[in-house]
Amino acid sequence: MELSYYEILEVEKHSNQETIKKSYRKLALKYHPDRNAGDKEAEEKFKLINEAYGVLSDEKKRALYDRYGKKGLNQAGASQGDFSDFFEDLGSFFEDAFGFGARGSKRQKSSIAPDYLQTLELSFKEAVFGCKKTIKVQYQSVCESCDGTGAKDKALETCKQCNGQGQVFMRQGFMSFAQTCGACQGKGKIVKTPCQACKGKTYILKDEEIDAIIPEGIDDQNRMVLKNKGNEYEKGKRGDLYLEAQVKEDEHFKREGCDLFIKAPVFFTTIALGHTIKVPSLKGDELELKIPRNARDKQTFAFRNEGVKHPESSYRGSLIVELQVIYPKSLNKEQQELLEKLHASFGYEGEPHKSVLETCISKIKDWFK
């Protein structure tokens, strides 16, 4: 079944232009040929995304499409319409994202991605309190033997597929747009004989140790950036290194944002009588929790400003204690007798089920009279 233009752009039919453009840009980046070299499926999706956006970004064409579908567009001659605004927007977008425009105004770009992402493993303690950590990284550096050309003796030939433009023009339905040349990957030049040092990759890998300051309160999947510690995309110029935290869980504390949760096991007699217990604090001292009589299982109590500090502000969350009522697994003879006496001492109050269930039983019996 053919997808609608709305389904292709992953938006609702009532979506406004801002939502449509935002979704288009996200999908165009995801499936762009520069990021999916040799992937035919991604290439087809990229074509469909552009075709869909070419219609939905134009209110007149969108109205025709909503009423008559693709046939209505063709019959109305929409394929001959003015797409200058669309291409202008498309060109500026890809100029920023990939280094070239939609109409062939290309600037030379390195095959090395400036920025890269690395996982940073942290213990619960390191994440909560922050720390200084030495990180081992491996980054891409411009090959000195070929000056990043990937070619032996730096000898490059003009690409015959695109005549050195780095782009080829394609037509999809009533859409016409530029696409990165697959033969030269948008460079306009091709390698005849690969460089022996980098095997034609244009870069070599270098190891480095970096001292990073981990902020107090960083959370799992949070990212921090180390400027100028990424790949060397041009001689002497490096991108940024992004570190994504992977925080190990603690056996006692559970974390949700800046709030900490801890379960406090308490015996059932403590719930009946009320009691004061000690609760651990991140600050190293002990907090007193006064459990009121007849507290409930899973009831929570919050200590404000005893949680985790926000990594980018002075805000600090809460420590939330959840009661976990524990009952004895077995009773000895003396305990059994004591509990039976205690139960009997409550009289009718000790059997609250009777007032509810016996009334219900009587009601049901009346139904069958």
Swiss-Prot record:
Zinc finger (CR-type): 130-207
Compartments (UniProt record): Cytoplasm
Residues binding Zn(2+) 2: C159, C162, C181, C184
Keyword Iron attached: no
InterPro entries hit by this protein: DnaJ (IPR012724), DnaJ_C (IPR002939), DnaJ_domain (IPR001623), HSP40/DnaJ_pept-bd (IPR008971), HSP_DnaJ_Cys-rich_dom (IPR001305), HSP_DnaJ_Cys-rich_dom_sf (IPR036410), J_dom_sf (IPR036869)
PROSITE patterns per the UniProt record, alphabetical: DNAJ_2, ZF_CR
A GO cellular component entry from the record: cytoplasm
MF-aspect GO terms: ATP binding; heat shock protein binding; unfolded protein binding; zinc ion binding
Self-association state and partner proteins as the record states: Homodimer.
Similarity comment: family membership: Belongs to the DnaJ family.
Function: Participates actively in the response to hyperosmotic and heat shock by preventing the aggregation of stress-denatured proteins and by disaggregating proteins, also in an autonomous, DnaK-independent fashion. Unfolded proteins bind initially to DnaJ; upon interaction with the DnaJ-bound protein, DnaK hydrolyzes its bound ATP, resulting in the formation of a stable complex. GrpE releases ADP from DnaK; ATP binding to DnaK triggers the release of the substrate protein, thus completing the reaction cycle.
Record remark: domains: The J domain is necessary and sufficient to stimulate DnaK ATPase activity. Zinc center 1 plays an important role in the autonomous, DnaK-independent chaperone activity of DnaJ. Zinc center 2 is essential for interaction with DnaK and for DnaJ activity.
NCBIfam families: DnaJ_bact, PRK10767.1, PRK14288.1
Protein name: Chaperone protein DnaJ
Species annotation: Helicobacter pylori (strain ATCC 700392 / 26695)
